[in-house]
DNA sequence: GCCTAGGTCCCGTCT
DNA sequence: AGACGGGGCCTAGGC
């Protein structure tokens, strides 16, 4: 099913890639190339052997010798192929990104294949799962906590969980499924302030940050603002 | 130079990949596989044809049919290869990430190559370039602005540019080289508050957000807090 | 070592 | 369409 060329000429490789893309196949090119990105930010890749993947959604990624992220990429397309001066693959990534041009002086291997089925994924352990867990067992936040609404809207944005504590005090809960940083504290602070403005003037409002952990600076920020931290991890995570 | 196998058995592919990695080569495997990630977050990829890249830094990325990001990945290693039940590539990504296992029921193409030179990049148009531009022409921020220090430290973190406005008022400048969101406004707010606490009690402190543009909500946030927005783009960007 | 900030962030979701 | 927030974000730099 997959087709492969070894050491093709630029013309052959260009025709091969164009035909494969027209058939909805993924194209893998391995070879020596240079790349330039022109746009808001300018990036140039010196000559080196890399892997280019041209996916059926017209995403182009260029992977180098290290790292999870591609050395260069573009999506938004369309993708154009040219064989005038070596094989050149180009794609315009739109206004915010820029235009990518990859020029191969030698293609070692060109492969085209049908990426059938390569999409279905199942995920767990996200913030949504943490929310489900807290709604199922509100005492995890603190004993007596009662959720009343999720995504309750305020002028500062939607509150993850809105409810009352054991004393009946209005409480905003902000969820993070990873260790929380200062941004989470100020977001919670904005929600609490918005609730105080929204409710009648002398209303007491509490804020609780629910996350597996917080950074030291965030813990101080919370304390300074009279906010509470409650350690809860998403279900199924190893640290329980 | 690059070596290629077509439709190898699991044993052959495993030996091929192991040898290539030992030689510091990059390995590309194209074939039908399933993948599982176990850790804080659980992710499962159903059977599909994908590209696996095993890089010389022991990063493993698995690319599917769409998107810039890999469907699965691991780094931190070490990477292990096993041929007991189809070709299996595994890598432990550490505590926060999890362990990745990719099992191929069929390898269509296995390629190994030396990713020589695939590292050098030059970049421009970043926040650093915007800073250079502002330091070179401070009037871009506003007429009469005088930079005094960069990365000036405060309890809330380092201020991009610290200086005085035309009236001599202490001013904190926060730079963003892309359209700024609410996080930039609250970051600037934290810096201004920290400066007010640090300097003598009745000190006036201004805050200016310098970016090519801001979102509407951010513009309101800034106005509510008495902060200023000054539109400046990084040098060489298309919108000047 | 942890933590913070930047990114062509990407990507989903909602207005 | 733009906009906002989450992410196994990744990656570089600072302490």
Swiss-Prot record, chains A, B:
It comes from the Archaea. Pfam families: NucS_C (PF01939), NucS_N (PF21003). Its main location: cytoplasm. It is an enzyme of class 3 (hydrolase). The keyword Hydrolase applies. It is found in: Cytoplasm. NCBIfam families: PRK04247.1. PANTHER family: ENDONUCLEASE NUCS. One of its GO terms (molecular function) is single-stranded DNA endodeoxyribonuclease activity. The keyword Cytoplasm applies. It comes from Halobacterium salinarum (strain ATCC 700922 / JCM 11081 / NRC-1) (Halobacterium halobium). Belongs to the NucS endonuclease family. Cleaves both 3' and 5' ssDNA extremities of branched DNA structures. One of its GO terms (cellular component) is cytoplasm. This is Endonuclease NucS 1. Keywords: Cytoplasm, DNA-binding, Endonuclease, Hydrolase, Nuclease. CDD domains: NucS-like (cd22341).
